């Protein structure tokens, strides 16, 4: 079984890349949890409006700007995923340093490109 991805910053807006990422992850049979600030669904995935202790998260796919990530630092570190993908525009050296110190892998990449190349 493939491990779960948390899309942090998911949007019900079909024009947003986070929305497309959820759809492509599901198309690739990867379990997805979506977290966002606007209610809705993306394909068959409900957008969670509250944070939970999702123990099964392997990867966080980041779609929050660096300034909006600050309030999630503790949550991300406590969740202790295997990796965090910083999609274009979400790169955050401060959080990357914290991830390094916690031994959490991270990469500046694009979830959609990784999926299209079969490199996810």
Regions found by a protein language model. Give the residues of each.
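Conserved beta-strand elements of the Class I
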Residues: 4-6
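Short hydrophobic segments within beta-strands
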Residues: 8-11, 35
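NAD(P)-binding Rossmann-fold cofactor-contacting core
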Residues: 15, 22-43
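Short phosphate-binding/catalytic loops that engage adenosine nucleotides
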Residues: 30, 81, 104
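Rossmann-fold NAD(P)-binding glycine/threonine-rich loop
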Residues: 88-115
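A charged, well-structured terminal subsegment
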Residues: 117-120
